[in-house]
Structure formats: C-alpha cells, structure tokens
C-alpha cells in the first residue's frame, strides 16, 4: 500500500523511482494506491510523471487506486490539471480506479474502493448498499483514503480496511490532538476490532513541506491469509 505522495512537493522522480525499485523486490501480488498521490501544487507534467513511474511496480493482479481529498484539486480555483485529465492518465498507465465500486480479484479476494468523503461532487454510497450481495466467504478489503465509517464497515462484514490521509500527525502535536478530537477513526497503525483489521499508513511523504516530527514515511507490505 502506498498513500500520500503529494508528488512534486516532498518527493521527486528520482526518489519515487527508488521507492518503486524497493517495492519490486517485495514482488507484490496487488498494489494499492490509497489516495493523495498528487495535490493542488502538482503540475500537469508532474502528475503524469507520478503515475507513469508508479505503473512500473511489478504485480500479479494489478494496481488499484482510490482518490484522496487532494487528488482532484478540491482546494484551489486554479488547478494545474482537471479531474478528467487525471483519470485519463491513471487509466492510460494501466491503473484501475475504484470509486464506490467493487473489483473481484480472484476466487478468494474482493476490493471495495470508496469515493473520498471530502469529494463534494460525488455522492458517496452507503457501504452496506455498496457491498450488498458480496460473498461473505470471500475476503474483502475496503480502500478508503480517510479513516472513517469503520463501524459501518465492520457491520457490513468487511475483513480489512486500508486508509492513509492522517500522515500520523506529521508534525507534533497534531498526532496527539487529532485522536482526542475524533477527527478520524484511527490516526495510525494497526488495530483489530472483531473481524475487521484496520490499517492506517503514515504515508510515503509529507504534505506542504518536507518535514516530519511524528512517525516515519513508509509504504506498507500486507500479508493476507485465507479465511
């Protein structure tokens, strides 16, 4: 799982190529891009460069992407690229976009990709409706950029939920304050509640500036066992 590149601000092509090289040594079956890979400061050439580079990750079953709250330039009136240009580039690079839809990977695994809750131009589906009819004997993984609605996912029968967004606080004392304000269901790390495995990554880069005083930058390798 890779999340929160915010490409062009805190990570450049050479650094991203090194990340791709390291991930390729892990021989992943599936690659999850969990949102905010680009943002309002990412130029059109940088956006194209980011996804083209990420498409070089070797995999068995594909690369899957969900939007974060920044990818579509939600916070600027003068974007460098449009949501249409973004989607076209991602698709051209062989990456599958999941936005409130389901992708069956094989006989054992299903991905449920969520629309970001901060996207005012997209009415987000109810997780129960979205997963209606899914075979509960299969293992299904929910991809949701922002760590939210975990209780609803658990009730619906989710096995794993993967999120980013928080940067684990990035700068002290944000990581201490945000859990107290209940801004997200989980700020960072791994928690198991009932049958639901919850994972929130700190992200592979920072937002706004290349500084961290909370947690480390990371990509996450997840080993999944059959039910």
Q: What are the roles of these predicted feature ranges?
A:
Residues 1-227:
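Soluble catalytic domains of enzymes that build or remodel membrane lipids, polysaccharides, and related
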């Amino acid at each position: 799982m890779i999340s929160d590149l915010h490409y062009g601000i805190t990570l450049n092509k050479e650094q991203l190529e090194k990340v791709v090289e390291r991930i390729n040594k892990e021989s992943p079956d599936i690659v999850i891009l969990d949102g905010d890979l680009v943002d309002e400061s990412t130029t059109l050439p940088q956006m194209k460069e980011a996804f083209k580079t990420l498409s070089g990750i070797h995999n068995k079953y594909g690369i899957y992407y969900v939007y974060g709250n920044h990818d579509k330039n939600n916070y600027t009136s003068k974007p460098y690229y449009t949501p249409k240009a973004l989607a076209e580039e991602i698709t051209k690079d062989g990456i599958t976009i999941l936005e409130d839809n389901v992708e069956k990977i094989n006989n054992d695994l299903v991905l449920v990709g969520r629309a970001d809750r901060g996207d005012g131009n997209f009415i987000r589906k109810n997780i129960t409706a979205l997963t209606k009819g899914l075979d509960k004997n299969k293992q299904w993984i929910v991809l949701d950029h922002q760590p939210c609605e975990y209780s609803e996912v658990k009730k619906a029968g989710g096995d794993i939920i993967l999120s980013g967004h928080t940067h684990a606080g990035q700068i002290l004392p944000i990581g201490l304050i945000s859990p107290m304000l209940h801004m997200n269901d989980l700020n960072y790390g791994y928690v198991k509640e009932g049958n639901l495995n919850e994972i929130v990554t700190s992200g592979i880069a920072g937002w706004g500036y290349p500084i961290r005083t909370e947690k480390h930058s990371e990509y996450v390798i997840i080993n999944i066992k059959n039910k």
